[in-house]
Amino acid sequence: MGFINNNMNNLLDFNNYILESKSIYLLDPSTKVTLLKLDEKYHKLIEKFRTKYSAQTVENIREEYKKFMAAKENGQKYFPKLEIKNSDFDKNIYEGFGKLIDEFEDIEDKCYIAKFYLEKIHAMRARLERLKQLDEGTYEPGDNPVSKELYQQALQCVKEHPYKRPDYEKDRTNESDDVLEKIEDALDDLGYDFDVKIFSGMLPRMNVKMDLVRINKTSKFSDEDIEGLIAHEIKGHVGRFFYGKKTGLWLFAYGLHSALDYDEGLAVWNSLNLVEHPKPNIMFNISIKTCISYLMYEMDFCDLFDWLKKQAPDMSDFAAFKTCIRPRRVNKDCEILSGGPMTMYFKGYNMVKEMDDQMRDDILHYNIGPNQKYELENIKEFLKVNHFKPLK
């Protein structure tokens, strides 16, 4: 019986070998070597970009807030001028993206997924082109990238989920050390090989960078905060990076172009459905970001602040100011009618909530976005027939 089983297994292995060898997604050995080298170059360049431009903080936010409110009290308008470290155009990274585009174009006709690298690199290079134009004073905002229909959907959601002012002093009793321990336990339970460390000088209370979860030393957390952060940050963002690395390509660790829609959408869905006590204002927060993303192209900063205060009268002036500032960081000059849209939370959640469990599991494991939804089976076959090893 064992002899028959061994023969059957050998036959199945042989049949799989024949099928894989005929796959249109199979790379020739030389192209696979080239792809792996380019993937590593991509990783190093993306890290340079992320190190410089991700999680940027406004260094003079309190000073600009005081100027803004003082002008407002005098019946005047003041448009904040933001100081942001490492926000200048980086010629070396820009040229590096250009060279990488040329190299991926050389294998595009032989490598199915080269187009996904190119899509992502072109998008990141465009962000740098915008910074260059802002530095040179030649930037033109163009048409509103957010549709009026999406704005109206988000505005309706704001009305259905009004803002409730949290009682932070009452609820936030957990120190950063307590959070570190609970995050480590959650990572162990999920099998995610990530470190957790406490940092000083962070603006957010918690963020994720590569294989590291960083917690703000001075922040305090409620029990609901911790539960929500595990669902959102760990089961969402960390999970997609972790499983992306298992594919064997950095492309999937960082996420394909448009993956941020699913990334934030899944994280929000987790925050609402994988916890016993969802945090207040989740739906308000994701919908108000979309409204602001549309309106910042239609009204000036001062009018937008007033609009937000009407929608959320219980929100503190400083919280409203920060909410309006956040998408404007890319411009630095808040007099410019544009910014970096933050629609991915609302759009992404509305996509993810309509998915079945299998699709949500797929977007967790393959880190795709809506642009690649209908190519997922092709991506799976490409990874299967080319036998990539998990990244370390």
Please give the residue ranges for each predicted region.
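Post-HExxH zinc-binding segment in Zn-dependent metallohydrolases
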Residues: A253-M296, G348
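Short, glycine/acidic-rich hinge or "gate" loops at secondary-structure transitions
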Residues: T138-G142, T247-L249, I282-M283
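Conserved alpha-helical "signature site"
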Residues: N281-K392
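Short alpha-helix carrying the canonical HExxH Zn2+-binding catalytic motif
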Residues: D223-G239
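Post-HEXXH active-site segment of zinc metalloproteases
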Residues: F68, E224, G239-D263
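Active-site-adjacent bridging/hinge elements
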Residues: M206-L212, G239-Y243, A319-C324
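N-terminal low-structure segments adjacent to metalloprotease catalytic domains
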Residues: G2-Q152, K392
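Contiguous, non-catalytic segments that form substrate-binding/exosite surfaces or channel walls
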Residues: I101-F221
